[in-house]
Each structure stands twice: as C-alpha cells, then as structure tokens.
C-alpha cells in the first residue's frame, strides 16, 4: 500500500458509501501494506464510522492471497495482481495509479495486452469510474458475472500460463541458436599458461557438443597461434 500504488484503493473507499446503497451486504477487503497504509486506514475507518459497520476491512500485508481472492465476487486492481485474480476465475476491474481500463471482458483485451495490464496511456482512474463499473457488474445476472470470470481464466490458461511462458522462452532460445552469431571468449589466453589453455580447450569442446561448428572468437595475446591451435578466430 505504498503511495505509488494506493490511488485506486483510496478511490474505491471513496466510492463505497454510494456502492453500499445499491449492493446488499457489501464487504470490501483491501490487501497490502506500505508507506501509505495509515492514510488508507484513516479513510476506511471514516467510511466505516459513517456507515455504522465495518464494510471495509484492511488486512495489511498477506502472503495467502489465494485465500482472500477465493470468496470474493469482484476484484479491483492492476497488473500481476489482476492476472492472479483472473487465474482464480474472478471478474476484474483493471485500475491503477497509471490509468483505468475498467471491467475486463473481450472488448478490453487489446488495450490490456498493449499496456501489459498496467493501464499506462489509458484515461486516469477516479472514484466515479470505479463506482460505475462496480455497479455495472453487480447489476449483471449471475450467469453473466460467471462468464466474465471464466473468460479471464481461459485467457490466463491460453496466454499467461507457466507452460505458455516456458514455451515462449524455448522459442527465443531456439531462434538465437539458429543465428550464426559469434561466441566471444575472453580470458588470460595466449600467454602459454597451461591452466588457462586447458580451460579454453574445455570451453570450446563443450560448445561443440551443443552446436556444430560454433562461430568462436577468442581474445588472445597471440591471436595467430591461438587461431591455429584451437581452430577459432
């Protein structure tokens, strides 16, 4: 709950009195700690006092986020936190200090991907936008609410799963290995030091096991001799 990340929490708290009028048994859970926690808590306490009950609960820092997300119906947040909520099958309102995307569905996919779900370059968030989309969500029938959660989860499984990330990484490595780029080796070479010469030979042998005819360049005090003996540049 650092000041650089607490804007939306404050805006949501500001909107709670109006949302509470329309949503029965409203409960808002704010998770996190940081240098702005006390200010956020002061706002929450003031709203709770005004409403006469603890609508807003601040948990402080937590590591068991899954247990807090599981019972919720709607998540408000940004970036990785929003993706984690989507992975848990929860509808999300994507909003952060950098901007506002809103209640996430297929129509918001392009801007979500373009901004890495961080909202940079989007319209700025404010309490009215948050209130509008929270009420919009709770006015949907249960089937539509469920569909929003399912859409987010399927997106995570398809585009942001561990398997997908690993596959993408492997593709990058495969692409790099196909390029005939020079492999530069720098060390204490060309000085007839048996230890360093043995190390260089071992490195070259290992590289040749992984790639046939690697394009190796060695920085050496005696380039001609090193090139002739090790068959490198």
Where on the chain are the PLM-derived regions?
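Short, polar loop motifs at secondary-structure junctions
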Residues: 33-35, 62, 80, 220-225
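Nucleotide-activated donor-binding/catalytic signature segment of Leloir-type glycosyltransferases, i.e.
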Residues: 40-61
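Acidic donor-binding loop of glycosyltransferase active sites
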Residues: 67-83, 89-93, 98
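A short, well-ordered alpha-helix in the C-terminal region of glycosyltransferases
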Residues: 136, 143-159
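Conserved catalytic-core segment of nucleotide-activated headgroup transferases in glycan assembly
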Residues: 1-39, 199
